[in-house]
Every structure is written in structure tokens, then in C-alpha cells.
């Protein structure tokens, strides 16, 4: 926030705002790059891509649009098709390519961890990443970003879509586990998601919580402003589920797309050819 104040910049609400801020900040001697974001080949880059698609108004598959920034998560009556030939897909890819001009030289090696570490070292003025990694600067007094960071939903490509996705982990039981072990496993799963454990995770660095009672704990709120900001985003309906719709073949789709879109972003392959390849690759996992 200190660098934004230095240049009298408003927090970017749209991708155009973001590019403007990057252009202003690119000459600042205090930082190496205006922004850092995950762009490593495979899952990190593909995730950045499909989240940008969401900011341009489309999920990566053809969920039914309801209105505003809402898509129907019920796919039982839908013949699923990939959305990588949509206008949103083209716009998202072009935006990410523009963003490379304001990003670290080693951007193509940045997964989520490297991205936030770069920001926490004061090398970039902004970062696009998950809140769970904010401990690298929120709880680190040696970080130049300590107590100098503001939080926003991801910037909008289309006006209604200044939104960010829900992250998290899925806990399950393997189908081949011995039946007598299931009660023990279930007991541990319940412990892992209990308010007591969630608070423990937060106190040891995971600055996110799916449990309202924990988020509203004064001790938790005092750790970082991030909880108030995420709570505000949720109340404003800017936290969405559909951007990373959890299909069984999601990981396969994302890994393939992340390799293909890399060729456009970093190797200058033709965009239409790249997106046709993404569409074909994703569709084979949907058939």
C-alpha cells in the first residue's frame, strides 16, 4: 500500500486499472517488478489462465449462467464442453501475455510459493495469489510488505466479474481401505476440520479459514487484516466456486492446458492455434 500511496494510485479493480498501475510502477527503483503471479508451466499457469477467464465472465466448462457473476454448479443435465474457444479465453490469454511485460524475469519458474516469496521480499508491488500464503509477509516483521499490504478480489475483465475463487483441500477416504479403519480415519478428518485445528493452522501461518466461528475470533482477527477483507469480499458476493469447477478430470485438464498456454505466453505460438489445442485436449477428458 505504501508504493500505491507514493504514486497516488487507486487499488486496481479491473485489468485495465492493473495495467495502468503496472505502467506507473515499472520505473520505481524500490522494486524489481510491478507484479508477480504464478506462471510456471502446468498447473500454476493454467490456474492463472482459468481464473483470468472467470474474470472475463466464463468458467473453463459450459456451466449454465444464472445472472450477475453466478453460474449453476449442477451439471447433471448438461453435456459438458470446454470453454477454451470463448471470447473470455482469448481475452484472458492476451491479458496474461501483457502482464508478462511487468513481471519478474524468472516468471516462468514461479509457482505459487515463488510468487509470494518474491512479493514478501519487497521485489514486487503486487501479487496475485492465494490468501493461505500471506503469512510469508503478514507474520514476518522482516518483510518489506509487513503491515503494508491491502487485499482485493482479482481484477475484473468484465464489469460484474471482479471475483476470486474459493481455494482449499478435499479430504477423502480411499476406496480400498480396510473397513475397520474407516472410523479411525473419519475421527481424524473431523479433527482436521474442527474449529480448534483451524485456529491452530491460522496461528501457525495459514491465513484462511472456512469456519465462521474461527474467523470471528478476536485473537484471529488481530493477526492480520486479511480476515476482515476476505469477510468483506464474501459479503459482497465476490468469492465464487465455479471458476475451478471440481470435475474428476480437473487435474488432467489443467495440466494439459498449462503446458499448451505456456507456448503462447512464453514461446509466442499463435493464440488461436494454442486455444484450439487447449479445447481439443480438455474435451477428451469431458467425453
Name these PLM-found stretches:
Residues 21-22, 115-119, 133, 185, ...:
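Short, hydrophobic alpha-helical packing/hinge segments within bilobed ligand-binding/sensory domains
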Residues 1-19, 39-77, 165-174, 253-262:
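Periplasmic solute-binding protein
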Residues 27-39, 194-205, 284-287:
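Bilobed periplasmic-binding protein-like "clamshell/Venus-flytrap" ligand-binding domains
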Residues 125-130:
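Paired acidic/hydrophobic, glycine-rich loop segments that form the ligand-binding mouth/hinge
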Residues 22-24, 63-108:
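Glycine-centered hinge/linker elements that transmit conformational signals in sensory
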Residues 15-20, 107-121:
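Short helix-initiation/N-cap motifs at beta->coil->alpha
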Residues 164-165, 210-214, 228-286:
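C-terminal capping/gating helix-and-loop segments adjacent to ligand/active sites or protein-protein/ligand interfaces
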Residues 6-7, 80, 101-102, 139-209, ...:
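Extracytoplasmic/periplasmic substrate-recognition and gating elements
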Amino acid at each position: 500500500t505504501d508504493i500505491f500511496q507514493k504514486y497516488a494510485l487507486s487499488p486496481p479493480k479491473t485489468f485495465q486499472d492493473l495495467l495502468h498501475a503496472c505502467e506507473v510502477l515499472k520505473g520505481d527503483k524500490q522494486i524489481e517488478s510491478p507484479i508477480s503471479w504464478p506462471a510456471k508451466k502446468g498447473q500454476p499457469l493454467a490456474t492463472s489462465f482459468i481464473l483470468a477467464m472467470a474474470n472475463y465472465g466464463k468458467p473453463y466448462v459450459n456451466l449454465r449462467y444464472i445472472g450477475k457473476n453466478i453460474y449453476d454448479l449442477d451439471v447433471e443435465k448438461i453435456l459438458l464442453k470446454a470453454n477454451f474457444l470463448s471470447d473470455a479465453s482469448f481475452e484472458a490469454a492476451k491479458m496474461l501475455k501483457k502482464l508478462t511485460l511487468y513481471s519478474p524475469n524468472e516468471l516462468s519458474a514461479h509457482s505459487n510459493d515463488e510468487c509470494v516469496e518474491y512479493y514478501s521480499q519487497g521485489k514486487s508491488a503486487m501479487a496475485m495469489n492465494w490468501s493461505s500464503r500471506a503469512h510469508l509477509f503478514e507474520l514476518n516483521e522482516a518483510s518489506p510488505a509487513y503491515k503494508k499490504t491491502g487485499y482485493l478480489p482479482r481484477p475484473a475483465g468484465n464489469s460484474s466479474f471482479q471475483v476470486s475463487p474459493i481455494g482449499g483441500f478435499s479430504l477423502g477416504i480411499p476406496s480400498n481401505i480396510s473397513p475397520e479403519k474407516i472410523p479411525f480415519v473419519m475421527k481424524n478428518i473431523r479433527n482436521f476440520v474442527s474449529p480448534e485445528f483451524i485456529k491452530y493452522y491460522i496461528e501457525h501461518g495459514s491465513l484462511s479459514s472456512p469456519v465462521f466461528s474461527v474467523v470471528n475470533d478476536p485473537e484471529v482477527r488481530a493477526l492480520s487484516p486479511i480476515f476482515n477483507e476476505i469477510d468483506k469480499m464474501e459479503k459482497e458476493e465476490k468469492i465464487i466456486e465455479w471458476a475451478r469447477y471440481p470435475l474428476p478430470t480437473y487435474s488432467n485438464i489443467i495440466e494439459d492446458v498449462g503446458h499448451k498456454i505456456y507456448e503462447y505466453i512464453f514461446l509466442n505460438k499463435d493464440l488461436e492455434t494454442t486455444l484450439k489445442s487447449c479445447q481439443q485436449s480438455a474435451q477428451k477428458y469431458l467425453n
